[in-house]
Every structure is written in structure tokens, then in C-alpha cells.
């Protein structure tokens, strides 16, 4: 899958990500978008997928949802961070 079909969710406003997904579906004639998030951004990723499906692209479907836990090495030692990967198809 091309790297431009992946949306990494962070601290930007929710609608920025929704707009990016809608733009990719409409302009790039892609049929598959992956939304990725870790930690506190997981709930925002779910909101983004739901807003996209219900308000903008009603024919979008969930193809796959992956949940995972990643071990990250930080200043305070190793910590586990949850991650999600939501695949939307059209």
C-alpha cells in the first residue's frame, strides 16, 4: 500500500484529518485509507472514522480494525502504548 494512503492521527483538530481522508478518497481515486493512532489519540481516530463514514462518505466501509500494544523505551524505562489501525474502503 502506498504511504500516502496512511493517516497518522496526532494533535491536530479532528476535522483536519477528516478533510484529508475525504480529499484522498475523491482526488486520488484510492479505494483504501488506513487511519493509525497510538495512546490518547485512539479515541480521536475512531471519531475521525465515524465522522467520515456518517457525514461525508456514506459508502465507506470498515475493512479491518487492528488493535495492538507497542513497547516503547523512554526516559523512565519501558512502557506499553496501545495502538489502533482502522482501514476504510470505498
Swiss-Prot record:
GO terms for cellular component: chromosome; cytoplasm. One of its GO terms (molecular function) is RNA binding. Pfam families: Alba. Acetylated. Acetylation at Lys-11 decreases DNA-binding affinity. Its main location: cytoplasm. Keywords: Acetylation, Chromosome, Cytoplasm, DNA condensation, DNA-binding. InterPro entries: Alba-like_dom_sf, DNA/RNA-bd_Alba, DNA/RNA-bd_Alba-like. Signal peptide: none annotated. The modification N6-acetyllysine is found at residue 11. One of its GO terms (biological process) is chromosome condensation. The keyword Nucleus does not apply. It is found in: Cytoplasm; Chromosome. SUPFAM superfamilies: AlbA-like. Binds double-stranded DNA tightly but without sequence specificity. Involved in DNA compaction. Belongs to the histone-like Alba family. This is DNA/RNA-binding protein Alba. It comes from Picrophilus torridus (strain ATCC 700027 / DSM 9790 / JCM 10055 / NBRC 100828 / KAW 2/3). The gene is albA.
Amino acid at each position: 500500500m502506498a504511504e500516502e494512503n496512511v493517516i497518522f492521527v496526532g494533535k491536530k483538530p479532528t476535522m483536519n484529518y477528516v478533510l484529508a481522508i475525504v480529499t484522498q478518497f475523491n482526488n486520488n481515486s484510492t479505494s483504501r485509507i488506513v487511519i493509525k493512532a497510538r495512546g490518547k489519540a485512539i479515541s480521536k481516530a475512531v471519531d475521525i472514522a465515524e465522522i467520515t463514514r456518517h457525514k461525508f462518505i456514506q459508502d465507506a466501509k470498515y475493512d479491518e480494525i487492528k488493535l495492538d500494544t507497542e513497547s516503547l523505551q523512554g526516559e523512565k524505562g519501558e512502557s506499553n502504548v496501545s495502538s489502533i489501525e482502522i482501514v476504510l474502503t470505498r
